[in-house]
């Protein structure tokens, strides 16, 4: 709420995403942290959503059940080549992430690590859009 107060001083409107889960191997976030973060977020009108673990469909499903349908879930840790990265990253598939309850995928090396970044970005856009349409059926 301190950020929102600062925004009000400069007549800026914005929303906050809270970090509820992480996709990197060995991170220190546990289910109690996730629940406490969500409880904190429910008390603020400025929280528009949560960052979830894109590499774990089970954790996304749990997060969706905790936050409900009225909040967005953004998921980093997304790569069409699911598995592990060179620096401890864990990756999940965009389709699986969306099907499990994520609203937005965050892609890093799956795009910037490719020689044809435009084609890579289109592949992620198509995969996530198709998953959104399937989820809506």
Feature-to-residue mapping (PLM):
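Glycine-rich beta-strand-to-loop/alpha-helix junction loops that act as flexible
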Residues: 75-76, 107-110
């Amino acid at each position: 709420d301190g950020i929102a107060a600062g925004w009000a001083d400069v007549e800026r409107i914005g929303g906050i995403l809270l970090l509820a889960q992480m996709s990197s191997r060995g991170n220190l976030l546990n289910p109690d942290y996730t629940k406490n973060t969500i409880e904190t977020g429910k008390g603020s009108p400025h929280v528009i959503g949560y960052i979830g673990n894109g590499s774990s469909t089970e954790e996304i499903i749990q997060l969706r059940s905790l936050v409900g349908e009225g909040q967005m879930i953004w998921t980093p840790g997304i790569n069409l080549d699911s598995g592990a990265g060179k620096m401890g990253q864990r990756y999940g598939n965009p389709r699986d992430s969306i099907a499990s309850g994520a609203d937005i995928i965050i892609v890093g090396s799956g795009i910037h690590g490719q020689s044809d970044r435009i084609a890579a970005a289109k592949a992620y856009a198509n995969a996530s859009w198709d998953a959104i349409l399937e989820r809506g059926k």
